[in-house]
Amino acid sequence: MKSKTLQRLLQTAKPEKTSLIWGFIFLVLSSGAGLTYPQLVRWMIDNVVQPKKLDLLLPTVGVLFLAFVIQGIFGSLRYYLFTLSGERIVLRLRKKLYEKILSQEVAFFDQWRTGDLMSRLASDCATLQNTVSVNISQGLRNLGQVLGGFGFMFYTSWRLSTLMFVLVPPIALGAFYFGKKIRKFSKQFQESLAEASIVAEETISGLRTVKSFVQESAETDRYGKTLEFSLIAAKSRTKSIADFMTLALIAGFGSVCFVLWYGGREVILSNLSMGDLTQFLLYLMIVAIGVGSLGSLWGDMMAGIGASQRVFEILERESLEKTEGIALKEILRSIDFKDVHFSYPTRTDYEVLKGISFSIVVGEAVAFVGPSGSGKTTLGYLLSRFYEPTSGEILIDGKKISDYALKSLREQIGIVSQEPILISDTIEENIRYARRDATDKEVHDAARAANAYDFIVNFPTGFKTRVGEKGIQLSGGQKQRVAIARALLKDPKILILDEATSNLDTASEHLVQEALQRLMKDRTTLIIAHRLATIKDANKIFVLNQGIISQQGTHDDLIRQTDQIYYQLVQRQFET
């Protein structure tokens, strides 16, 4: 594990210091109790069995049983403390990862696919959870038994122990060699699982498209192929673990055969008692079992290291968003775009905006129209600071928007988009999403103003009606009116309407348009739209084409320019 990753993991474990210290104490006590029974067996053979002292047999066995009881109690406490601490460590790690993902700039999500991020939150954290909560505890226990066993073996017979140490270098080299391979294959396995998660997430979220094109079989095959890649990595990882376990077990139990030969010879030559040989063999079995268990745990530990590297790759990434600045409490004068150029970070070779300049006076409703891909929606993204301009400036009351605290800037902006996204909760909580401390009355008033109250109360559970994933249980018009109610409750100074009525039928559009008029009152509004009903009353209209402003003026001014784009757009709408 890289030192920085280990340092971050230890830092996350710091609040569990007390539990981990007690867990370590119980680990030492349980391992110590487990290491006493070979001594007791030796004493029983040399002082009870061989001298045939029947009166001492039951008390000796009783003491042996007591040692096992003590080991069991301390072992249980050790497991409880280590496992619970590990669960809490990974819980904090998962929360930090989620918080870090949400803190990233919007451009980050253009580059990272949702399935990959979900895989790191779910699969990688689960692997790491198993490593931190169970494997480390078991690994420390086995390591303690191995080291303690070696110590008592030296105490029993230094000659036998010295000969046994010949086996240590090959096992250590094997652990290093196979550990490197296991870590590599584990990371490949996690990455291929992430790819499978991406495919599944894309397919399920776009299920209607999949079914409409009858692509269920093709998507199943695509998912199956990504799983095959993970199976190949899993096979390689499992083979490496199996090879290492084989090496460890052969070395461990091969040493038992060696001890039986050499130790038996020492007993015959009277250099070692039968009790000493039995004690040595029992310690050797403890060491062999410990080494074998460490072999299987080693693979899991390497998988955990691979998962932790993927988790900390996100945790160590600093967001490019500048969040600090002065508070934006009100807008007094204007919003100004000055020679703004912009390219999306994932398409730096294509310039979406090419020197855009305009000014919006506070309280005005300004519309932006133009062909698809002309950069209309991008203006709203830049004003909300989802992205930063490549060059040029965006000002509010003469100050760059980057000088304002990001939170306070976005608190002053309300967005109603073409396809509003609702959270999978109740209608009430979706409206209250704008302001968590809003009262029920404020929520209901916002719904009335958005022409949403009547359809909401007609549901059997009213405002407690669950909307489903992304609001799938509601119609397009209903979702839009809930989104408008949410924006009304937020009470922003700046409003961005991004094609807010383009997907609605005539009846729904009328209700939504009426609600939008209430929403726009006394607010500075940027309207991105095609429909004439939305833009004809705007104070000013800007026509965008290929990233530049080709026309500007009121509807009456622009409609008279019959050879220009605006006139053509309006005529095309009437034709349809």
Where are these regions (language model features)?
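Transmembrane helices of ABC transporter permease
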Residues: P15, S19-G32, I70, V134-Q188, ...
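ABC-type nucleotide-binding domain
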Residues: E330-T576
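Juxtamembrane loop-to-helix connectors within ABC transporter transmembrane domains
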Residues: K4-T5, A13, F82, K100-L147, ...
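Cytosolic ends of transmembrane helices, especially the final helix of ABC transmembrane type-1 domains
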Residues: S212-Q215, K239, V287-I314
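Short intracellular "coupling" helices and adjacent cytoplasmic loop segments at the cytosolic face
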Residues: E87, K95-S119, S123-C125, I198-R222, ...
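An intracellular "coupling" helix at the cytosolic face of ABC transporter transmembrane type-1 domains
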Residues: V106-A107, S123-V132, I136, L140, ...
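Membrane-integrated ABC transporters
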Residues: M1-Y37, V49-V63, R78-G86, L93, ...
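Hydrophobic alpha-helical segments in the permease module
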Residues: V63-Q71, G75, V168-A175, I241-S255, ...
